[in-house]
């Protein structure tokens, strides 16, 4: 049975959505319709939200799951009249923390993601800009400033992994696509050799790579299984020859791939 889940906040909704998504991911056998509702910061908006929740409950025949980070108690009380199963993320975690730390929390809206109060904001933006500027081997003369350089065949997940590490941890990650020319030379391109200590390889199952490439260039040599199998085989051989640590991205989320890379390379997150 498909369930409905709402991520509701009187701020950006980032915290409610991130934690809610992580919790729901533990129930792989249950499909969810997920809706994020940020800036529910007035009684009128809260009452409209109640109508949406109740409509979902009537449609599904079971109450929706509600993850919220609402600070205003009046708004919370309005939401509590809905036919939803409420999970107040802040109070669930902050109350025991307050007891352990013997201190009261500030419990402010969007605190961890605010620009003015977040010293990591500019670091995050700079890391994202670095990932975009150094995507897909477009530029290589800034590799000395990179924390990591991801290498692998085209469309194996390098770009989303670089952007995720930039957004979440402030990591400056570049990526370089290995081509047939690189494979035929049986060695790393010169620009990568001098940064060998920063390299991490991504590989992927050939059938998955074929499916991804087919969406971009259907019925082409680029997306054929034979070509994908050849490239993956040659790149994995190159990784072994050059002693480049690597991971198969096929069955992992970008979050898992990023965490494994940072642990294996020993790269410290600029912020957590």
From Swiss-Prot:
EC category name: transferase
Keywords, alphabetical: Kinase, Nucleotide-binding, Serine/threonine-protein kinase, Transferase
Enzyme Commission code: 2.7.11.33, 2.7.4.28
Binding of ADP, residues: 152-159
Superkingdom of source: Bacteria
Cross-referenced NCBIfam families: PRK05339.1
Protein name: Putative phosphoenolpyruvate synthase regulatory protein
Species lineage: Bacteria, Pseudomonadati, Pseudomonadota, Gammaproteobacteria, Pseudomonadales
